[in-house]
């Protein structure tokens, strides 16, 4: 909402899909125009020209994506992020980078305080960024909902005449806090704020290995992927260019020539639920698998049995 009101000529949000379905719903509810494309065929050197084809129209206010990606768990490379950042600067667009799954590219030893490698981010390549970090994801702190929106200093302090005319507050950071957060949210509890601050402090001090804690998701993904693949399914978004995607919170599955809705409907008959890739903006056919609730050994056996029955009935 904020980004769409900074410049009357720029109201459109560009989604790099697939993405979190709720974000797409939000722009529809608010009546904000949007564009999107599926990154499946636009990795590496193909990404820049594709994004620029939208930015060159002159009406894109912000670019939105998640990294690691929900639902595909693909991770943009530093070169791809550099491309996005440089284009955002050139066309004066804001990058809203969803880092809900911070440091969960488990192929790399991330999350060690003040030691490389670090989380890949567009913030290295432009000043036009807003980073979103979720307490419920990186710290598995899902009870009292809380998150961080980190805004670059250059963007926070930037004056926008359109904001001043509309709200009598011209500085982006002030408008974000005093107008948009105040009016459009109920805030968050003091206890959640203290809890998140304590977890950030412990992570920075090296006493909380939050990446080690969340690596349990990679173990569950690895086990369930093996079961799906053994029964004839395939990973839809399977590569980060030439490298297999990391195991993590989500991944994507397809089966034969079934469409997303067909596969979802059929799996429900076997007691397996997911969401359709269509709802994520993907142009590929399949479903998103979430392993967060696969927390008991017998569930893996049950999944194996149900997928065996599915494969037998669809041979």
Residue ranges and their predicted role:
Residues 15, 36, 96-97, 196, ...:
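Hydrophobic residues in well-ordered beta-strands that form the structural core
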Residues 190-193, 197, 210-225, 229, ...:
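Conserved glycine-rich beta-strand-loop-beta hairpin in the small C-terminal domain of fold type I
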Residues 30, 90-91, 270:
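Helix C-cap/helix->beta junction micro-motif
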Residues 56-58, 125, 265-315:
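PLP-dependent enzyme catalytic core of the Aspartate aminotransferase-like
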Residues 41-112:
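Active-site phosphate-binding strand-loop segment of PLP-dependent enzymes
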Residues 122-215:
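Conserved core segment of the aminotransferase class I/II
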Residues 1-12:
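Phosphate-binding glycine-rich loop
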Residues 11, 90-94, 126-127:
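A short helix->loop->beta-strand "cap" motif at the edges of active sites that frequently abuts
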